[in-house]
UniProtKB/Swiss-Prot annotation:
Residues 46-64, 114-122, 174-181, 234-241, 302-313, 368-371, 444-461 are extracellular. It holds the Pfam family MFS_1. Keywords: Antibiotic biosynthesis, Antibiotic resistance, Cell membrane, Membrane, Transmembrane, Transmembrane helix, Transport. This is Puromycin resistance protein pur8. The gene is pur8. PROSITE patterns: MFS. One of its GO terms (biological process) is antibiotic biosynthetic process. GO terms for cellular component: plasma membrane. Belongs to the major facilitator superfamily. EmrB family. The chain crosses the membrane at residues 25-45, 65-85, 93-113, 123-143, 153-173, 182-202, 213-233, 242-262, 281-301, 314-334, 347-367, 372-392, 423-443, 462-482.
Length: 503
């Protein structure tokens, strides 16, 4: 007998227009402003992190929480955010998300200590998880004509894709010419303008369907992920440390309980059928696992460029542009043309191998490598960017193919959650690998200034080598799980479902 979910509510939907809303394009501007905040804050603090660490006195072990707190809260609550928007109204939750995001940004900018900053970043992630799915749903409501809706989603995708690059540049400019705190303060005026613009969005109206919020599933799923990430962050003291072992066991048990709960509740947060399918489950892994290396790479290269090569924050942001450009070109130009002619598995595996080759090039970094940007960093970023970009489109295609219409939103949300959660796990794990390798190097070679620099770079390269292994493992999983026979069945069985809003 199915157990009753925790909370049910009469859902509130945005009122559909009788004809095209004359203010729809202005409404899209409001939505895009909010989405830019969400995407930009995933990278804007990266460039400022060395300055943040010095100013607030963070340890090398704890610095990763500036990134992880945001991505973990965002990814872990994204599925719930869609349900909350359904229950209480998309425009209302969108406005609450913007307001909360702006206030959390002010709190982070004024943070007097690391703990306050970590809390603010987590709150940013919570409110981002509320407004992001509401934004997608509002675009569906605003644009009823298929042609206009396609254009709107195209612009939305461009902002989502370009926001990361904008964040890197903005982080460099704000840190160098103002202060790292402005990387967070800058969100407040944008959030205020978007909040005032909410009146341009469709009003919410009630419907007769009941929407149930799976709070036990949310608590178990997010709690399990937090425990595992915390264990990774504390593993510098050794994987056999009692605290680390307890956290890992707790995290695994909570995730097992989450899986059991999702099989029993009437309206699960994550429908088991979405992830039980072999190709879809493999695709979610393919989307999430590479983020371990990608997010870690942002962290280590930022410190390498500023701390070892003495790049300014602005120059650091510019130095990252080839990576973002490679992802955009790989996804929108190369993969878009190859996917109709190439099996997704073939394209995914080839792209992952290219990204692994680029990452492997970075394992040869040294403190005094001549012309290191031209000989190592630039070609590596191009390979990684093109590889990740060419991998994402076919992986998203197979992740959402043949999904039941009522589960399409959940499948799309899992794709987004996998990226954020993979990044959170990656930053925590690779930061621990790096600091552990550095500590071991210094124990063997002493702590002279030269040895400290060498040990720091050694830690980066060991962590990057670990990321290479993750990419190769992902390629193997893609080859095994996304098999040609199942792909053929998917392609002939039904058309793929376009990723919908998270539910």
């Amino acid at each position: 007998m199915a157990r009753k979910p925790d909370i049910s509510a009469v859902p509130v939907e945005s009122a559909a227009c009788q004809g095209p809303d004359p203010r729809r394009w202005w409404g899209l501007v409001v939505i895009l402003a909010a989405q830019l905040l969400v995407v930009l804050d995933g990278t804007v603090v990266n460039i400022a992190l060395p300055s943040v660490q010095r100013d607030l006195g963070m340890s090398d072990t704890s610095r990763q929480w500036v990134i992880t707190a945001y991505t973990l809260a965002f990814g872990g609550l994204l599925l719930l955010g869609g349900r909350v928007a359904d229950a209480f109204g998309r425009r209302r939750i969108f406005a609450v998300g913007i307001l909360g995001f702006g206030l959390a940004s002010l709190l982070g900018g004024a943070a007097p200590d690391p703990g306050t900053l970590f809390l603010a970043r987590a709150l940013q992630g919570v409110f981002a998880a509320a407004l992001a799915p509401a934004a997608l749903a509002l675009i569906n409501t605003l644009f009823t004509e298929p042609g206009e809706r396609g254009k709107a989603f195209g612009v939305y995708g461009a902002v989502s894709g370009g926001g990361a690059a904008v964040g890197l540049l903005a982080g460099g400019l704000l840190t160098e010419y103002l202060d790292w705190r402005w990387c967070l303060y800058v969100n407040a005026p944008v959030a205020l303008l978007a909040l005032l613009g909410c009146r341009l969005l469709p009003r919410d109206r009630r419907t007769g369907r009941a929407v149930r919020l799976d709070l036990p599933g949310t608590l178990l799923g997010c709690g399990g992920l937090v425990a595992i990430v915390y264990a990774f962050a504390e593993a510098e003291s050794g994987w056999g440390d009692p605290l680390v072992v307890r956290l890992l066991v707790l995290g695994v048990l909570m995730l097992v309980a989450f899986a059991l709960v999702e099989r029993r509740v009437q309206d699960p947060l994550l429908p088991p059928g979405v992830v039980a399918h072999r190709v879809r489950g493999g695709s979610f892994l393919v989307v999430g696992l590479p983020q371990i290396g990608l997010f870690g790479l942002f962290l280590f290269l930022t410190y390498y460029l500023q701390g070892i090569l003495d790049y300014s924050p602005v120059l650091t942001g510019v130095a990252f542009l080839p990576l973002g450009l490679g992802i955009a070109v790989g996804s929108s130009l190369i993969a878009a043309r190859l996917l109709p002619r190439t099996r997704p598995r073939t394209l995914i595996v080839g792209a992952l191998l290219a990204a692994a080759a680029g990452m492997a090039l970075l394992t040869r970094l040294e403190p005094d490598t001549p012309q290191v940007y031209l000989t190592h960093l630039l070609p590596a970023q191009i390979l990684i960017g093109l590889g990740i970009g060419c991998m994402m489109m076919p992986a998203m295609h197979t992740a959402t193919a043949r999904v039941a219409p009522h589960e399409a939103g959940a499948a799309a949300a899992v794709v987004n959650s996998a990226q954020q959660v993979g990044g959170a796990l990656g930053v925590a794990l690779l930061n621990t690998v790096s600091t552990g390798a550095t500590a071991a190097y210094l124990a063997d070679h002493g702590t002279s200034p030269a040895a400290t620099v060498d040990g720091t770079v050694h830690g980066y390269t060991v962590a990057i080598a670990f990321a290479v292994g993750v990419l190769l493992l992902t390629a193997v999983l893609a080859w095994v799980l996304i098999d040609s026979r199942t792909e053929a069945a998917d392609e002939t069985g039904s058309a793929s479902v376009t990723p919908a809003r998270p539910r």
